[in-house]
Amino acid sequence: MSQEISARLLPQKPSKWAKILLNRKVPIFLFFLLELAFLVFSYISLQEHFPSIILWEHLLSVFTFLYLLNRSMDSRSKLSWLIIIALFPIFGTALLYFSLADFGVRRLKKRLVEATQQTSDYLATEPEVEDYLPHSDRQLQRLAYFLEHSPAHFPIYRDTKVTYFQLGDDMLPALLEDLKKAERYIFMEYFIIDEGIMWGEILAILEEKAKAGLDVRVMFDGMNEMTTLSYDYIERLHKVGIKAQTFSPIKPVLSTYYNYRDHRKITVIDGQVAYTGGVNIADEYVNKRERFGHWKDTALRLDGSAVQTLKALFLTMWTVTGIEDKRDMEHYLQEKPQQRKSQGFVLPYGNSPSTYHKVAENVYLHLLNTSTNYVYIMTPYLILDDELVRAMTFAARRGVDVRIIMPGIPDKQYAFDIATTYFKALLDAGVRIFRYTPGFVHAKVYVSDSQQAVVGTINTDYRSLYQNFEDGVYLYKNLEVLKIEEDFEKTQALSEEVTLESLSKMPMAHRLGGYLFSLIGPLM
């Protein structure tokens, strides 16, 4: 059944040449190329007809350098921009101001602010939790205060049952079972959806539920139309009764809009159960297809009060992307999930480029700065700003056991090469780094002191921390924290430790490539 639906939603396979000509990437790439060629041609023409432009070019570079040096910005980002402007004064300066102006996303940010204000009315810490917090640990109070006073008002919950999945393989059967039990609605928001076994099984259930009259909604990032799905996939889903939207579809126009991607992975079922974590909807995430060896990923299942926040995050993006009015959001947010008795606290949150609060990074910094015994990290990428470098090295130097597990088989070699440029400073400070020998680590996990942990979609890199829409779940004194710690130790046992000696034996091409790419790493 699932394979039939999956095949039916795929377009008929064209010939090799038709595939090239009909591929949406081709016209978009050509338009981008033409726009770039026009800019280069205009610049060369100006130089030929107006020799004095070179003087103005130097003056512009000096002015921009001074502007950057006095601007509030991460020093590594500043360095990247300074290098680009030094090499390409006119183009680099134009690109800088074009990026800072953010013309392409002003409307998006305005709609985000409006939608976030609507959801915040339905997100509040429950009275019994508020009464308890003053008597709880100081570090929990501080983080809860920060997140509740962020623009989106993320509250802390107690009555939520949490299940941690060590692999996407373990998560999928539970997800399918919960989808089958849905009675009113299913909301799904994913960075990647790819045709295959996993999506076929999910899609079979979604179509069945849509036919039964449930409100079934699917939203995916616009990059899918360039990589995994056909450009008319939305219409194909509509035909089987599923409401669908694309976030930020790619069009042949230069815009900063494309820089912001929806990297979230959220499923909400009847407002009672929710899933999130690193697992996208594609076969490699559940090891049904091998791409980079064994795929190590993690996920959480929430059942109870905390689902309200993930539901609000989905409805915010759905409203921003589509044309739904305020009543649609109110209809679903007015109802609250049933409480489930559980030990500890659960605090889901979102990260958005529309706010300067750096929610995701500050949560990671909180774990690093408040830890007393250990901080264990699993991440596919490691492109750090100064704050994270300082926090990791300082934690290690004050005696905290800081360990990081990264892929043994990276999916992007350049990204791993950039990560290695941080290794020496981290190793010198006492941080231990491991590579997952069986394959690729896609998990985004921080766990500390057997008390607190974060599982979500947020990589430890610039794109996740500054540019993408992300989500995470902070756990405090929840029983699943111990399972996360145990999972890390099992994963470490399968990993090879990186040492200064092994680092020095890296191929020169990768070492050089890492340093070159790291110069523009914050902009990638």
Locate the predicted segments by residue:
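N-terminal localization/anchoring segments of enzymes in phospholipid and broader phosphate metabolism
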Residues: 1-362, 366, 370, 410, ...
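Glycine- and other small-residue-rich loops at beta-strand/loop junctions that grip anionic moieties
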Residues: 191, 381, 415
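Helical hairpin unit composed of two closely spaced alpha helices linked by a short loop
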Residues: 371, 381-403, 407, 412
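Thr-Gly-centered strand-to-loop micro-motif
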Residues: 378-379, 406, 436, 455-456
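Short glycine/threonine-rich loop-to-helix capping motif typified by GTGT followed
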Residues: 390, 416-420
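Surface segments flanking catalytic/ligand-binding clefts of nucleic-acid enzymes
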Residues: 432
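Catalytic-core elements of nucleic-acid end-processing and repair enzymes
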Residues: 444
